[in-house]
């Protein structure tokens, strides 16, 4: 590494961007690690810089790691390697643990997480989660980019391209507003919902309110009584219930199941019974919420019968 200091710019660029892991002795002085970061940022590729940060993350302070990570945004991103997502996840994990309660640093990290949205999974975008859970402004901004306004605005090619770029990140954003450590406080949730509705009205997109809210509320934690959703979300559903909210909630809840084995309808029958029990527990105090869970239960009952008959026909 010492020899490369004396080389010309082209040689330095070749050295720092080559597909060979950069090695720095564990016995090197602290200033060597900082020098390597600066040189790799100047001459290396996104992947070599990221790999270097991962390798020396325990050799520099968390503040230095934070600063160096933010500076990734200045490097042109090349094709992701097979290890890119792992390196990002590990580096972000350190920074999230240290700075998620620092509003300014959390916002900076959320911006960087968003830049890496095509590589990071949603569960690893903890600062972006916090930003969206605490305030609906950014989520509403994404809605304004992706969906047309109520006045049938003309969509130009530039906006269409932007919508395509951000949609994957929007689609990943599955969260219950204001949820923190498995708890949702009604007053906070209602405030979030009201602000979100106001933003949609200002964007001339009020028609989307029920659909979008239903999609998010399906990610509520379990209530204190052991039934879903939690009490605060039940209260909000009772207050803001619409057919579109119900439909979106049902779809989001059923989509959580993901890929599953076909077993002649046995799994669907169990789900039917589980959702029916949940609905019956809510029926007296939260009729609209119960209606949502009865609908999910009925859907699984029909699917169970269909799978059973199909299995019988195959025999």
Across the structure, where does each feature detected by a protein language model lie?
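Non-catalytic all-alpha helical scaffold/repeat segments
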Residues: 1-253
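Structural register within alpha-helical repeat arrays
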Residues: 19-20, 212, 271, 278, ...
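Non-globular sequence segments
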Residues: 244-257, 262-263, 312-315
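Inter-repeat boundary and helix-capping residues of tandem alpha-helical solenoids
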Residues: 261, 268-269, 286-287
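Short amphipathic alpha-helical heptad-repeat segments
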Residues: 264-276
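Short, charged/polar, low-complexity loop and linker segments
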Residues: 276-282
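Short, charged, amphipathic alpha-helical segments
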Residues: 289-299
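Amphipathic alpha-helical coiled-coil segments
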Residues: 300-314
């Amino acid at each position: 590494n010492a020899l490369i200091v004396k080389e010309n710019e082209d040689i330095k660029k070749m050295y720092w961007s080559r597909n060979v892991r950069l090695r720095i002795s564990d016995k090197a002085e602290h200033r060597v690690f900082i020098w390597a970061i600066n040189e790799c940022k100047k001459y290396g590729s996104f992947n070599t810089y990221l790999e270097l940060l991962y390798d020396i993350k325990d050799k520099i302070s968390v503040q230095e790691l934070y600063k160096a990570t933010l500076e990734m945004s200045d490097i042109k991103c090349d094709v992701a390697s097979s290890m890119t997502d792992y390196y990002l996840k590990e580096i972000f994990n350190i920074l999230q643990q240290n700075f998620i309660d620092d509003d300014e640093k959390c916002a900076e990290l959320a911006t960087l997480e968003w830049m890496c949205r095509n590589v990071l999974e949603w569960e690893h975008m903890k600062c972006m989660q916090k930003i969206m859970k605490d305030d609906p402004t950014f989520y509403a901004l994404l809605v304004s980019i992706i969906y047309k306004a109520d006045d049938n605005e003309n969509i130009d090619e530039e906006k269409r391209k932007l919508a395509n770029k951000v949609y994957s990140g929007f689609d990943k954003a599955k969260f219950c507003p204001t949820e923190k450590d498995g708890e949702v406080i009604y007053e906070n949730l209602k405030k979030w919902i009201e602000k979100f509705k106001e933003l949609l009205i200002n964007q001339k997109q009020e028609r989307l309110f029920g659909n979008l809210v239903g999609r998010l509320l399906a990610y509520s934690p379990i209530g204190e009584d052991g039934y879903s959703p939690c009490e605060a979300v039940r209260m909000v559903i009772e207050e803001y219930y619409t057919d579109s909210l119900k439909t979106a909630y049902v779809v989001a809840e059923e989509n959580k199941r993901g890929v599953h084995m076909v077993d002649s309808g046995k799994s669907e029958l169990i789900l039917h019974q589980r959702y029916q029990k949940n609905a019956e527990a809510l029926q007296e105090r939260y009729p609209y919420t119960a209606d949502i869970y009865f609908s999910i239960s009925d859907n699984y009952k029909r699917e169970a019968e269909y799978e059973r008959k199909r299995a019988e026909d195959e025999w």
